[in-house]
């Protein structure tokens, strides 16, 4: 066991555990809308939870809509915030000499030469988007591609360049992020021209407040659960980078020990897919939350990151059903990102970089989000606690703390340990022996399911079925229970255990009468009923199939 634990420590400890501020809240300014009472309430709540000094909380009179004009952004938010930071001596702007390069002459840049803060948090009620000005024109914009000759932007993304306010940057199109891909989080600060801006936002003030609560819970207990990735299996060179990013993110999660599911089908995850205990979800490409995410309950774990790549995924944050960001937050995600308007693929976050920085490098959410963006002053909004750092504790420390509290989350730590060793090529027999000898396996649906999976991979179907049945008795989550029943049905069929398969699928429909893919289960039951010569049951299932089947297309 100690040998296996050492692999876990090496695999996940990373370069993450770097020095941090004694009180991270000192590095945050909190911004709210004085015209929205709930905005100040969210700001005060966050400041209390993260110990943000009261003189770093700023209120401005802003639009009460999600959109604001460019003029309002400049005069009511951008300039007043910059002035407030200067007045409170939170940063000091001065001249910085930028040496010449082979491609660019030397120049003087005005930006902060000292800064006490690195993050800005925009609270529920602060507008989301700077509106497009149809009459906008700017010198030099004719050099941009036609589709980039626009001045609308996410408020977050525009404010990220607040340290360069004296530079009078162009407004048309995106600005290159010179810190894209950085591996040293210390570079991500105003003295290098960037402010890490996120939002505590969502469909309701309560959802917004809950984001910091879940972040703090995950920092204390760890981010545990499963990782799901939804590819399109696309070959078009214009869109393939999206798949490449997501695939690379999935490989990172697999290597650090997440139970990882990768869907290669062009469509999104179907509604009936049993998506249990979600720690990470990254996918594309649908306009509105769909499939498992449109169900009444989604099993997001505390601290979960969920992101769906779509051009308008954050067109509004107020809806629980439209687009993606609002619904994901409403269903329990802790951190997410999205686009307020068409960004084009290269203008969206590189989720491979994001995942690597969050996990391998131990960045905070705010740091990882901005290290992953190739451009700023563009369309990405970043929603969640910027200080959230899910991989800030070493794995061995987390394991000790969870075990000392007799927390069931320790089961996930053991699961990650097994998965890391499996990826490293350890023999299945060794992993099976570890789980068989582990006392926690006897009481854990999570570990018993893994043990059953290993038996199946080892070619021991009877042992696998027995252990899947054991897992069903150990209080699995609803979605895990569905997955176990579906898996058992397949295993029974493979072993010609027709009666067992029949009873298994009946149990699924009995326990989950609203299962989204009820039609598929009824078809299986019809076939099994016919095979077992259960004529009345077969007639009933045929009637149910007729009722559930979509009508044929009109001629």
Model-derived features: positions:
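Bacterial N-terminal signal peptides
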Residues: 6-16
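Short solvent-exposed coil/turn linkers within tandem alpha-helical repeat scaffolds
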Residues: 440-443, 474-480, 509-518, 535, ...
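Alpha-solenoid helical repeat scaffolds
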Residues: 435-436, 469, 506, 523, ...
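Cysteine-dependent hydrolase recognition
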Residues: 22-436, 441-444, 458-462
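Register position in tetratricopeptide repeats
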Residues: 423, 457, 491-494, 527-531
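Single-residue signature of alpha-solenoid repeat helices
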Residues: 430-431, 464, 501, 538
């Amino acid at each position: 066991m100690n040998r296996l634990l050492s692999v876990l420590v090496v695999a996940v400890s990373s370069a993450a555990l770097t020095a941090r501020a004694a009180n991270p809240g000192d590095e945050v300014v909190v911004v709210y809308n004085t015209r929205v009472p709930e905005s100040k309430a969210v700001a005060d709540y966050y400041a209390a939870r993260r110990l943000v000094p009261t003189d770093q909380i700023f209120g401005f009179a802003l639009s009460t809509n999600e959109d604001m004009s460019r003029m309002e952004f400049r005069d009511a938010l951008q300039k007043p915030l910059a002035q407030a930071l200067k007045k409170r001596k939170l940063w000091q702007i001065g001249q910085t000499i930028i040496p010449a390069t082979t491609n660019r002459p030397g120049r003087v840049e005005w930006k902060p030469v000292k800064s006490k803060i690195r993050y800005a948090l925009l609270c529920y009620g602060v507008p989301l988007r700077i509106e497009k000005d149809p009459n906008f024109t700017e010198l030099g914009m004719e050099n941009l591609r036609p589709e980039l000759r626009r001045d609308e932007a996410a408020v977050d993304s525009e404010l990220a360049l607040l340290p360069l306010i004296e530079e009078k940057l162009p407004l048309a199109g995106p600005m290159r992020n010179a810190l894209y891909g950085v591996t040293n989080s210390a570079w991500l600060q105003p003295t290098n021209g960037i402010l890490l801006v996120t939002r505590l936002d969502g469909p309701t003030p309560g959802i917004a407040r809950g984001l910091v609560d879940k972040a703090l819970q995950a920092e204390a207990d760890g981010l545990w659960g499963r990782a799901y990735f939804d590819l399109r299996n696309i070959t078009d060179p214009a869109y393939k980078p999206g798949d490449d990013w997501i695939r690379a993110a999935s490989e990172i999660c697999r290597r650090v020990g997440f139970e990882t599911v990768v869907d290669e089908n062009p469509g999104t995850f179907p509604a009936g897919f049993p998506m249990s205990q979600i720690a990470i979800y990254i996918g594309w490409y649908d306009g509105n939350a769909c499939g498992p995410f449109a169900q009444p309950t989604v099993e997001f774990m505390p601290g979960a990151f969920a992101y769906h790549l779509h051009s308008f995924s954050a067109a509004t944050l107020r809806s629980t059903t439209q687009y993606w960001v609002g619904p994901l937050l409403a269903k329990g995600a802790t951190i997410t990102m999205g686009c307020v308007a068409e960004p084009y693929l290269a203008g969206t976050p590189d989720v491979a970089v994001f995942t690597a920085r969050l996990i391998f490098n131990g960045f905070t959410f705010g740091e990882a989000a901005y290290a992953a963006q190739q451009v700023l002053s563009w369309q990405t909004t970043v929603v969640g606690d910027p200080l959230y750092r899910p991989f800030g504790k070493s794995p061995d420390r987390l394991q000790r703390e969870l075990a000392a509290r007799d927390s069931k989350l320790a089961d996930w730590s053991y699961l990650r340990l097994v998965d890391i060793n499996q990826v490293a090529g350890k023999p299945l027999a060794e992993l099976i022996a570890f789980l068989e000898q582990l006392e926690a396996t006897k009481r854990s649906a999570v570990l018993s399911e893994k043990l059953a999976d290993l038996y199946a991979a080892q070619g021991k179907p009877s042992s696998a079925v027995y252990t899947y049945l054991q897992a069903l008795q150990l209080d699995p989550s609803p979605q895990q229970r569905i997955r176990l029943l579906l898996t058992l049905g397949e295993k029974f069929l493979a072993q010609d255990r027709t009666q067992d398969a029949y009873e298994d699928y009946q149990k699924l429909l009995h326990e989950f009468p609203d299962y989204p893919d009820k039609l598929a289960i009824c078809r299986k039951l019809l076939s099994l009923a016919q095979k077992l010569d259960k004529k009345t049951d077969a007639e009933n299932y045929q009637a149910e199939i007729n009722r559930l089947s979509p009508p044929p297309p009109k001629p």
